């Protein structure tokens, strides 16, 4: 049976974790998570449209569903464990993508967000996608890597309004993991989850001289 939360990349990961570490409770957790997920989507889904950015909200609802279904056993530390394992399985990408040498991933990300901004404007002119993120491309005028801001995060808004503000920073922290697989690093100084007015992203190669300036920066 394909469950509703299977649309999220986290669904299968959480199921595998439960089967390994909570085998006696796994089936019950899956059933409860399914119901929680449906309720979150029905009652709490903002007007984000159908796009890659909107899938981030479905990931968040999946994480919350397993968190609640397990009586909070599947907490933030478990989320980091799950995401780290998923990233480790993708280490083969490092053979093909090197953040110190490859420019195409940055160009691809930039094109993706340029297209998103274009679609967002078209939809918002019609009164749609009104709750989605604002994306500012290279607001810090970086000449290296890829820099952008996400502003008005609907996930952070949901977390604050529903008492999940302690859980969300763990999800934000997982942004670092896939970058490391591709010999890159994420330099981030603030997130909305931790009270910032935006989430900043600056991806550079893991051999970048820029990292020296931020060597004491906590991964958030």
In which residue ranges do the predicted regions lie?
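Amphipathic interaction/junction segments at domain boundaries or subunit interfaces
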Residues: 58-161
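Activation/maturation switch segments at domain boundaries
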Residues: 6-14, 189-193, 198, 204-220
